[in-house]
Amino acid sequence: MTTVVNPVLRGFHPDPCFCQAHGKYYLATSTFQWVPAVSLFESEDLITWTPLGGALPNLDLRGIPDSAGIWAPDLSYDEASDCFWLTYTIARQISGAFKDVSNYVVTARDPRGPWSEPVFVNASGFDPGFFHENGHHYVINPQWDPRPVEGHHKFNGLVMQEFSLEDGLIGEARVVLGNSDAVKWLREGPHVLKHDDWYYIACAEGGTGKQHRIRMARSHELWGPYETCPEPLVCAWMSDSPLRKSGHGNFAQAPDGTWYVSFLCSRYLPERDGSEHVFDENEFGCTTLGRETGMAPIVWRDGWPRLATGGVAAPATFEVAGDAPAPQTSFAYQTDFASGEDLWSSGWLCPRRVAGGWWNVGAEGLTLKGGDSPSSMFERSELVQRACSHAWHAECSVAFEPRHYNQTAGLICEYDSRAFHYLHVGWDENQGCRVVQVLSSGKGVFTMPLGDAGIEIPASVATVRLGVTVDHYDLTFSYAFDDGEWQTVADADGNPLVLDASIMCDELAGFSAYTGTVVGLICVDMWDKSATATFGSFAYRDL
């Protein structure tokens, strides 16, 4: 047996959905405003997960608000046609009474692609899932009710309807699991499976925060009526598990017959004194890494799935058959960009757009053409990697010759357009030279922590190296010129400038914040859009 440590996918990997086909496992996670949309992974043993890139590489999400975009993909395998189905939601707004969502499905013989052109499914709600049986396909999702009057509830039950790729929706949609007995549970993210003589619905409940969980319902008939299990399958608010917000899962069966459940989870920052965060539903906590992907084996008892580890707490570890090497629990990555690697299968993400000629990999490295500011929801020229730990370091090298203070390029650490720390090369007209500067945005405040005077870059310097180190709550920047020694960015008193890394978390980024901390490269030109920056290297490692 091999012990696997949760989360199996660390950092911003929410809403996992996986399936097993031909002896391999395939998993999809939400990407929201980031593209290539819908991150895909492959594994032979549930231990090592290889990124396959995004299923939707050319999706244009310009103008989509933060944490809108691609929600809760459902990846399923139809044995009858030997085909994978991937359905997903495009949410065009995040707040207000309306959701303005559209649901689509794409298909492929191989999860590596190519995937078909999207087929519209419906717009009645979000988080659709597909169930396949005897050549028929059924879509299930929560139906949304925006009417702000008594007697109506926004999460107005789970509805199911037959669907075909050729003819679209077939027959009438039926409510198969209502909210009359538990209006407050906010049921969403449904998946249907069949085991023995039972049909099961697995759905998320309790919202995306500390009360999140997986609830099961079952019926002998696909269309119901369904009875709800009195206890959740997975949750964290009833336990002392370090994996909080646990919920939103689905099931896959291994070739040896063992069943597994996937779920999202979050690891809170420890208290500032180093002690473990103590859970209290009314207490504030920080989850800078966002929601991650966990897994656990299940057993069937009295016709219900139960965690094989016992109880309802998301397990910190679990066992899988075989003698595979223990999984890596820390992550490291580096590139010189000139190696010809596929950026997308290496985990790079962009905000809202991939196409448009704003990036190029050549002999000198990665060149970015100046785009919008870090606060823009339209045309940013930016590539990022997910942060995977509460303590990590990243660095890059950049060649950049700005001519105006509105032209900048460098290393950005962000949660979204509202919460970021940005170390960059810019131009200072008063100093008459290039400078290293810092911009920060968080908690509704936009600041320049170094004040108006940046760190002067000598005219002879060709390449500036920029670094960031995050140690839980504390973030520090560093820089070096060409092959010179690293210097810590200091405040006016000569002390290391220590910034607040915790502003980049679900709880502080703002209402409906669903992503996680990322770090990467950006080039901004709010002057004449002519500036370009060439990044010769990038490296990330957990500490």
Predicted regions, residues:
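Carbohydrate-active catalytic/glycan-binding domains of CAZyme proteins
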Residues: M1-L543
